[in-house]
Amino acid sequence: MSAVALEKEPLRIPSSQDFAAFVTRSEVEDLLYHEAELLDTWHLHDWLALFTEDCSYFVPSTDLPRTASADDSLFYIADDAVRLRERVIRLMKKTAHAEYPRSRTRHLVSNIRILAANAEEIQVASAFVTYRMKLGNSDAYVGSTHYRLRRIDGQLRIVEKRCFLDLEALRPHGRVSIIL
């Protein structure tokens, strides 16, 4: 039996040059690092200003496929702009018992990749680890985030943030009371 050689087109990895007309890698990195800093310092109103008026923020449950929709699946978080604003207002109040006193957090962002870009939107993915420290306990949330970004008045803004947790369950955490 003779071996048949299959000739395949080599896999092409997207380059920053592919998207240079629309966005630079450093612009995207600066936005994501700035977002992490705002969350760690609890400047949530400033963080909210990074989003568009038609934004959404999703954290699907860990057993769902990445293509799942909040319309027909149970998500830990499925916020539109109104709910996201309400979440920020609630978290900043002393009556947000799960976060009073506030947790200390450290958002680490890495492996930032521009997946696609055109004149309207930019699709970005990154890996994250968010550490939450409170009352002598420490939790780690690990996963990846997919963003849809849009340039508005020359600035990149978040249209959609979708956090995929790599945890098999939220135990021992039990809940997501911080913003990932």
Curated annotation (Swiss-Prot):
Answer whether the UniProt record assigns the keyword Manganese to this protein: no
The keyword Oxidoreductase is annotated on this UniProt entry = yes
Per UniProt, what is one GO molecular function of this protein?
Answer: dioxygenase activity
Induction field: Induced by p-cumate and repressed by CymR.
Residue ranges the record marks as coiled coil: none
Listed A to Z, the keywords are:
Aromatic hydrocarbons catabolism, Dioxygenase, Oxidoreductase
Protein name stated in the entry: p-cumate 2,3-dioxygenase system, small oxygenase component
Q: What does this protein do?
A: Component of the p-cumate 2,3-dioxygenase multicomponent enzyme system which catalyzes the incorporation of both atoms of molecular oxygen into p-cumate to form cis-2,3-dihydroxy-2,3-dihydro-p-cumate. The beta subunit seems to have a structural role in the holoenzyme. Also able to catalyze the cis-dihydroxylation of indole-2-carboxylate and indole-3-carboxylate.
Named in its record, the pathway it takes part in is: Aromatic compound metabolism; p-cumate degradation; acetaldehyde and pyruvate from p-cumate
Which Pfam family, giving just one, matches this sequence? Ring_hydroxyl_B
Q: Which Gene3D superfamilies match?
A: 3.10.450.50
Q: Which PANTHER family match?
A: 3-PHENYLPROPIONATE_CINNAMIC ACID DIOXYGENASE SUBUNIT BETA, BLR3401 PROTEIN
Q: Which proteins does it associate with, and in what oligomeric form?
A: The p-cumate 2,3-dioxygenase multicomponent enzyme system is composed of an electron transfer component and a dioxygenase component (iron sulfur protein (ISP)). The electron transfer component is composed of a ferredoxin reductase (CmtAa) and a ferredoxin (CmtAd), and the dioxygenase component is formed of a large alpha subunit (CmtAb) and a small beta subunit (CmtAc).
One GO BP = 3-phenylpropionate catabolic process
Give the family, as the similarity comment puts it: Belongs to the bacterial ring-hydroxylating dioxygenase beta subunit family.
Name the CDD domains on file. ring_hydroxylating_dioxygenases_beta
